[in-house]
């Protein structure tokens, strides 16, 4: 009984006093849930007999204090709310610079693949020449490939000097660095091709602005001959094309071509206009005026022959790359257009050049209307025809009979403020209204 009373008193003191005053190991009879059993030690012999079944334990906490003193404590303030920080911009991935050995290996692979492709093109070109010697006709695609291969082979002629002259091959990397255009087309990468096309497009846009101003100025000169209305319509149409990016139609170009029948010829163009046309067709604008005219004339002849081949084979057989190349050769936009838009502008060119017989110089200047900084509008699908509901003829006859018997006096009252053309119309309408009112009164 005394042992039980001692354990109860110690338990009550422990829950109300600090853990520093009374420790658990003073009496093994007191047990707590927060104790951890330590099986490494044997039970002490000095303990009482009733506690023989209890193994010694160590407290899992250093202190055991009552929570009563914490009840009156003020609540902790909430953490200050910070505004959400804006998301950090994504950093561009850092380009790891290749070592010297890797760059040398990449250049060796690049030249190996270039010579390999050139050898394949040479074999294919030899077969095409054999077919030509036997009287066969090449397609447009085969003809262009043969011409490209021949141009690549002629580009290798200057490099023979580096092979013939002793120790001059060490200057070959310097020569290629200074004149990269001397290499054949098989050595050109896709990134360099895209960069070159974008630069040419930027130059064409500048030339297109100048040519648009030239066309407007020529139209003002012919204002007295053609009339102010036609010139004003043309000026407004040019402004519309510049502002909205709308593609000019074939009918509009043919209609406005009458304003420039006499002036838009290669003989009447000035040097600035000749230079702009050469840059539009990707020709070197170097030389005298006669040389520039000769270059343009020869280019227009080759374009006409190419147009005849395209019209014979069909625009649908051309790939996207061929459509873009053909558009660039004719001074038209090639980037930023879908395949359908490329085909549409190529068909329009063929119609104007072959069917409408528009002068080549005017045709080139009309391409300046296509080269705008705005993105061209997509081709809109044809609107579906609205079906007209069928009307019963009996209902139509009944409505017409009601209209004949109706009184027209309210209609005439609403027209008091309008100016009538002549007094005879008023008299006739008044007579008809009287007759109609009499008929309605008689019940006819």
Swiss-Prot record:
Alphabetized GO MF terms: ribosome binding
Compartment annotation: Mitochondrion inner membrane
Keywords for the protein's UniProt record, in alphabetical order: Membrane, Mitochondrion, Mitochondrion inner membrane, Transit peptide, Transmembrane, Transmembrane helix
Residue ranges annotated for the Letm1 RBD domain, each copy included: 199-417
Transit peptide, residue positions per record: 1-24
Membrane disposition: Single-pass membrane protein
Annotated region (Disordered), positions in chain: 73-94
Membrane spanning residue stretches: 156-176
Pfam hit, one: LETM1_RBD
Mitochondrial intermembrane side: 25-155
Chief localization: mitochondrion
One of the record's GO cellular component terms: mitochondrial inner membrane
Residue intervals on the Mitochondrial matrix side: 177-444
Compositional bias (Pro residues): 74-87
Protein name per its UniProtKB record: LETM1 domain-containing protein LETM2, mitochondrial
UniProt source species: Xenopus tropicalis
Name of encoding gene: letm2
């Amino acid at each position: 009984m005394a042992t039980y009373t001692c354990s109860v008193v110690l338990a009550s003191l422990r829950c109300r006093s600090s853990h520093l005053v009374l420790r658990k190991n003073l009496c093994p009879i007191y047990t707590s849930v927060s104790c951890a059993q330590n099986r490494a030690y044997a039970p002490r012999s000095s303990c009482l007999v009733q506690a023989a079944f209890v193994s010694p334990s160590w407290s899992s906490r250093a202190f055991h204090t009552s929570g009563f003193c914490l009840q009156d404590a003020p609540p902790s303030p909430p953490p200050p709310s910070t505004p959400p920080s804006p998301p950090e911009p994504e950093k561009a991935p850092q380009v790891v610079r290749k070592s010297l050995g890797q760059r040398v290996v990449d250049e060796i692979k690049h030249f190996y693949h270039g010579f390999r492709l050139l050898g394949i093109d040479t074999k294919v070109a030899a077969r095409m020449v054999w077919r030509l010697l036997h009287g066969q006709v090449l397609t447009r695609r085969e003809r262009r490939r043969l011409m490209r291969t021949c141009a690549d082979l002629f580009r290798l002629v200057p490099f023979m000097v580096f092979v013939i002259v002793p120790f001059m091959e060490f200057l070959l990397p310097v020569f290629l660095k200074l004149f990269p255009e001397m290499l054949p087309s098989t050595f050109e990468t896709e990134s360099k091709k895209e960069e070159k096309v974008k630069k040419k497009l930027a130059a064409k846009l500048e030339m297109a602005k100048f040519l648009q101003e030239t066309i407007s100025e020529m139209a003002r000169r012919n204002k007295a001959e053609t009339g102010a209305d036609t010139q004003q319509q043309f000026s407004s149409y040019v402004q519309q094309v510049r502002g909205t990016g709308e593609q000019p139609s074939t009918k509009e170009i043919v209609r406005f071509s009458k304003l420039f029948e006499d002036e838009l010829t290669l003989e009447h163009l000035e040097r600035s206009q000749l230079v702009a046309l050469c840059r539009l067709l990707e020709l070197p604008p170097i030389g005298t005026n006669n040389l520039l005219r000769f270059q343009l004339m020869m280019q227009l002849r080759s374009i006409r022959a190419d147009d005849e081949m395209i019209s014979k084979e069909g625009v649908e057989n051309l790939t996207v790359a061929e459509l873009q190349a053909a558009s660039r050769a004719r001074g038209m936009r090639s980037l930023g257009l879908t395949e359908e838009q490329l085909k549409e502008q190529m068909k329009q060119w063929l119609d104007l050049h072959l069917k409408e017989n528009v002068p080549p110089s005017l045709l080139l200047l009309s391409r300046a209307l296509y080269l705008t900084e705005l993105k061209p509008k997509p081709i809109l699908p044809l609107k579906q025809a609205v079906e007209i509901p069928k009307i019963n003829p009996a209902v139509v006859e009944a409505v017409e009979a009601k209209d004949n018997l109706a009184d027209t006096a309210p209609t005439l009252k609403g027209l008091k403020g309008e100016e009538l053309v002549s007094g005879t119309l008023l008299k006739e309408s008044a007579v008809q209204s009287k007759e109609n009112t009499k008929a309605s009164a008689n019940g006819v």
